Amino acid sequence: VKKINFLLSELFQYAHSEGDIAKNPMRNVKMPKKTLFKPEREIIALESEEVRALEQVAVMKRKNGLPLITHANLIVFLVHTGLRCGELQALKWSDIDFCSKTVTVNKNLSMVCDRDRNGERKNHKKAKIKGTKTTSGNRIVPLNTKAIAALKNLHTIYRKKGICSPNVVASLNGNMLSNDQLQRVLHRVLKYAEISKPFTLHQLRHTFATQTLNAGVPITVVSKWLGHANVSVTYNTYIHVLESVETTAVTLLEAI
């Protein structure tokens, strides 16, 4: 719109300077204000029965009694908290309060360019834990019964396998799992749950938001749990869910 406005203004200004027109009609044209609404994009989320299937896979065991998928409980934890992948990777066991049933989110793992002694960028990136990008990213998220169970199950598995790490996300040697490794865990869980839809870790966050909104949790509360900068971000992202909730509400109104 800005480009078209500029080109037309220049065109009419030239015509005015040449005497072809009395005045530039674009002179008093004002640009429209930016709208808060973004073009609607498709949000993929798991259905309730698919979430139940993930939970069942997380507790599956091999014949030797060990879990079928070591880190499957991380997937269950994500779908019940809505944390970003980087926030999960930066999470310490000390961030979990089992008494108050909350998790404190104040860190984020991101991939940054590594540099040599001269300050030049190297071809590879390294993982670095930083504070959350925004103030709203620092938050306390409540843990439901299933999120608590997933963490306790994971801690038990770590103990049985001799994994000793302050990190909630840890490999067999105690190192942090990468995004790709977590994505592979998700793919394995989806396979055993017989869910064929293409799915990413971030869509577990969408699933959490969708299910909480459908359950009737106020959007302001959901926005706070997700760590969004403001409630309009939540509204614009999940407007389709809110429209569905409104439709259900209208149906209930008819029953009064």
Where are these regions (language model features)?
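Short, basic (Lys/Arg/His-rich) helix/loop patches that form interaction surfaces
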Residues: Q56-L68, T81, V141, T156-N167, ...
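C-terminal flanking helix
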Residues: S9-F12, H16, L242, E246
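Basic, Lys/Arg- and aromatic-enriched nucleic-acid-binding interface segment
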Residues: K2, S17, I21-K23, R27-L91, ...
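A short, basic/aromatic helix-end/turn motif that makes direct DNA contacts
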Residues: A90-I96, S223-A229, I239
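Conserved tyrosine-mediated DNA breakage-rejoining catalytic core shared by Y-recombinases
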Residues: N28-M31, E50, L91-T156
